[in-house]
From Swiss-Prot:
Matching NCBIfam families: PRK05327.1 (NF003717), rpsD_bact (TIGR01017)
GO cellular component terms, semicolon-separated: small ribosomal subunit
Keyword RNA-binding: yes
Name of the protein this chain belongs to: Small ribosomal subunit protein uS4
Lineage, highest ranks first: Bacteria, Pseudomonadati, Pseudomonadota, Gammaproteobacteria, Pasteurellales
PANTHER family per the UniProt record, alphabetical: 30S 40S RIBOSOMAL PROTEIN, SMALL RIBOSOMAL SUBUNIT PROTEIN US4M
InterPro entries: Ribosomal_uS4, Ribosomal_uS4_bac-type, Ribosomal_uS4_CS, Ribosomal_uS4_N, S4_RNA-bd, S4_RNA-bd_sf
Gene Ontology MF: a single term: rRNA binding
Length: 206
């Protein structure tokens, strides 16, 4: 399945919640009709079956993190192999992706922009260039903007926006140096309460 390149707000309307695919610090406002489905008249959303709810939750999380279906299934398999709660393991793996960490540290306004920075070799991990968005960041890894990329206006603008967002407690960021440390693995309480990972586990457990 190809990566979706259409209007970002349409995806948020389809899921009925802000997926934070657009830059900025404010949630999508009421003019965007987040509670109505995409389309000229915003068709009424049908009541979903259990399977439909599970599928919709998986699609929502997949879109939040910008993951293709095959990648997402592989993350689930890995989460299921690990000790502990499979759903929480899944979210931790997604949060540990380099593109997500770059976004969380404020070097990019969206995860899509973070993926682009990583792919364009603008990010270093422990002093070495890493251009793989799915690279798993480990505790105590230092993630930084590459020296020759620090003058990019979009990175500076993103850091200014990040000052207005809630800062993740599992990361330590030095905005002036454009670098940060992955201090610890995030706990479930650190992450979005709007995600019901149990539905995803139920879907893949069938």
């Amino acid at each position: 399945m190809a990566r979706y390149l259409g209007p970002k707000l349409k995806l948020s309307r389809r899921e009925g919640t802000d997926l934070f695919l657009k830059s900025g610090v404010r949630a999508i406002d009421s003019k965007c009709k987040i509670d109505t489905a995409p389309g000229q008249h915003g068709a009424r959303k049908p009541r979903l079956s259990d399977y439909g709810s599970q599928l919709r939750e998986k699609q929502k999380v997949r879109r939040i993190y910008g993951i293709l279906e095959r990648q997402f299934r592989n993350y689930y398999k890995e989460a299921n192999r690990l000790k502990g709660n499979t759903g929480e393991n899944l979210l931790v793996l997604l949060e540990g992706r380099l593109d997500n960490v770059v976004y969380r540290m404020g070097f990019a306004a969206t995860r899509a922009e973070a993926r682009q920075l990583v792919s364009h070799k603008a990010i270093v991990v422990n002093g070495r260039v890493v251009n793989i968005p799915s690279f798993q960041v480990s505790v105590d890894d230092v993630v930084a903007v590459r020296e020759k990329s620090k003058k990019q206006a979009r990175i500076k603008a993103s850091l200014e926006l990040a000052e207005q967002r809630e800062k993740p407690t599992w990361l330590e960021v030095d905005a002036a140096k454009m670098e940060g440390v992955f201090k610890r693995v995030p706990e479930r309480s650190d992450l979005s309460a709007d995600i019901n990972e149990h539905l995803i586990v139920e879907l893949y457990s069938k």
